[in-house]
């Protein structure tokens, strides 16, 4: 190895050690800095207002029992603060970190409901985009399809706890992800035999959907009913449309 190569290795090694030392020093200095402010951002609200900045700060500080502003950054445990915020059932995820300006940054992702559930006309719950069963929120009412069941509700935490619950969740997700069906389907009823009835927002027909399976095929038939049959026969001609039978659309 030449003298020039040895010299370059020494220079690079010294530069690396210097950089590591500077980063470590900056970290120590930053840990001793006091929190100046708390910045809360509710991500991707999309018209959902289940929580707000004030409530997030209350949860994070245990209703001001544990002060954050004025506390040294090194004394803050972001993980503990995240866990406190996530005790709100409508908070899907919380990220807490310290920035270089002395602020505590809090990013909150809310749960997104896809249906509001009524059980025997009494119990009232939301179902979110992950299938979780959530309580009703006094702050906000989500504009989502209503779903009723005629049997005892068996899913305590998540629809995906059972095979049938997973099928129901897939049906709700299918409706949620399609802009037309999301606007058209207002009411979903699960009957005692496990079959589904859909009630549209605009037209008067009850849709006998059958079991929550073969979603693509059944919704394709329903679209044919709306696009080809109703315009020819009249929008108020039929009271019911049955999608349960393969290759048939039965109108009554």
Please identify what each model-predicted range represents.
Residues 1-44, 49, 53-72, 76-87, ...:
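Charged, solvent-exposed interaction patches on well-folded alpha/beta domains
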């Amino acid at each position: 190895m030449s003298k020039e190569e040895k010299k370059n290795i020494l220079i690079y090694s010294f530069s690396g050690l210097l950089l590591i030392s500077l980063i470590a020093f900056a970290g120590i200095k930053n840990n001793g800095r006091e929190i100046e402010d708390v910045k809360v951002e509710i991500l991707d609200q999309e018209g959902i207002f289940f929580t707000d900045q004030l409530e997030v700060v209350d949860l994070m500080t245990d209703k001001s029992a544990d002060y954050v502003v004025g506390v040294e950054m090194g004394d803050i445990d972001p993980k503990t603060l995240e866990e406190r915020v996530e005790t709100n059932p409508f908070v899907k995820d919380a990220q807490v970190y310290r920035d270089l300006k002395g602020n505590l940054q809090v990013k909150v992702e809310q749960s997104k409901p896809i249906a509001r559930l009524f059980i025997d006309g009494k119990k009232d719950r939301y179902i979110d985009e992950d299938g979780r069963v959530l309580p009703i929120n006094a702050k906000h009412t989500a504009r989502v399809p209503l779903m009723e069941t005629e049997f005892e509700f068996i899913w305590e935490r998540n629809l995906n706890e059972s095979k049938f619950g997973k099928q129901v969740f897939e049906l709700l997700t299918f409706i949620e992800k399609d802009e037309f069906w999301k606007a058209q389907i207002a009411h979903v009823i699960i009957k005692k035999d496990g079959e589904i009835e859909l009630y549209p927002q605009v037209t008067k027909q009850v849709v006998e959907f059958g079991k929550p399976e073969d979603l693509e095929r059944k919704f394709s038939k329903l679209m044919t009913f709306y696009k080809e049959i109703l315009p020819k026969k009249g929008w108020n001609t039929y009271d019911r449309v049955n999608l349960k039978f393969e290759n048939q659309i039965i109108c009554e």
